[in-house]
Amino acid sequence: MTRSLIVGMDDTDDSRNALARAAELARAAGLRLVVVHVRHIPVCAEMSAMTIEPARQNLDLIEAEARQAAEGVLQGTGVDWEFVVRSGDPAHALMVMADDRSAAAIVVGGRPHKAAVSGLAGSVGAAIVHRFHGSVLIVRGGDSAWNPASASGPVLRAVPPQPVGSAN
């Protein structure tokens, strides 16, 4: 079984940037890329069927946009990939997927600059970094797009217990 690299994907520029970096890593390490989109509706007791249905329709639209964005980013990369949809808490869903696939790492996008100053990479990235036992890469987008040729870049935190692509 080919090892995989899990990347969280929504309809944001940050996740597209993270996906592009994940594709580079997957190609270099010979990993299968698993693009995970997580549908999340916070439900409260006051929500009725009339408010839940429009929220679900909006999630369908966001999912379609995320899938289309993934196809656009990965077209022509030569990377073996799949698009997977899960429901629930995004951080938890990404960690479960990584465990299920014995993934080499999880890659997510992070908010640029202001979040870095506060010490947070975004709620999903921060939750994964604090709770996941494996490798995590948070790629910051915005004005400081990652340049693999430079020693510096927007990577906020990478926690590798072993080299990406190495056997367990």
Describe the residue ranges of each PLM region.
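Charged, low-complexity cytosolic intrinsically disordered regulatory segments
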Residues: 39-106, 117, 142-168
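Short beta-strand elements of ligand-binding domains
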Residues: 109-110, 136-140
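Hydrophobic anchor at the start of a short beta-strand
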Residues: 33, 81-82, 136
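Small/aliphatic-rich secondary-structure junction motif
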Residues: 2-49, 131-132, 155-168
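Glycine-rich, Arg-bearing micro-motifs that act as flexible, cationic patches
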Residues: 105-131, 145-148
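Short, conserved glycine- and acidic-residue-centered signature motifs
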Residues: 15, 63, 121-125
